[in-house]
Amino acid sequence: MKKIIFTIGLSTLFLTSCSKTSVQSVQTNPTTQQQPFVWNAANVYFLLTDRFNNGNPKNDINYGRTAETAKLRGFEGGDFKGISQKIDEGYFSDLGINAIWMTPIVEQIHGFVDEGQGATYGFHGYWTKDWTSIDKNWGSEKEFQDLVDKAHAKGIRIMLDAVINHTGPVTNSDGVFPSDWV
């Protein structure tokens, strides 16, 4: 008797699960809600401005920086327009980035320095000459404002590295510290 009840139950289950009733599709209009920015959950992209993307080759050489440098020790052309192009293309959004940390953008020393690796310019942004001016190799104040506006429109924050402790190249005096300092 148990076998008969089990067989009838299984048959009923099988027959009802194979019905020809169609599933009705429901059209919904999803709403996008701006999520608050939370630094503890930020996905930060560290960006070396000069090395990222060259959006304007016309600003590649400024301040007479034409000396031949050691390999990868000179300016390579990355600039604000290049970063803006990548924001427009969705590069950062596709990676899930919501904050870009950029190397310093202030005007760098104009000449090169040899720290033992060959002629090197301040392409990295850490050899400040003028704290009140943007280095022309990276673009203008307007181009930087455009970059920030484009980033904000995509929910991306911009952070600038502020270097106050080591603002210039190594010198011969750097290793000479008074004995009571160490």
Residue ranges and their predicted role:
Residues K20-R157, N165-T167, N172-G175:
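N-terminal structural segment of carbohydrate-active enzymes
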Residues M1-I4, S19:
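Positively charged n-region of N-terminal signal peptides that target proteins for export
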Residues I4-L13:
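Sec-dependent N-terminal signal peptides
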Residues P178-V182:
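Active-site-adjacent "subsite" loops/lids of carbohydrate-active enzymes
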Residues L15-S17:
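C-terminal motif of bacterial Sec signal peptides marking the signal peptidase cleavage site
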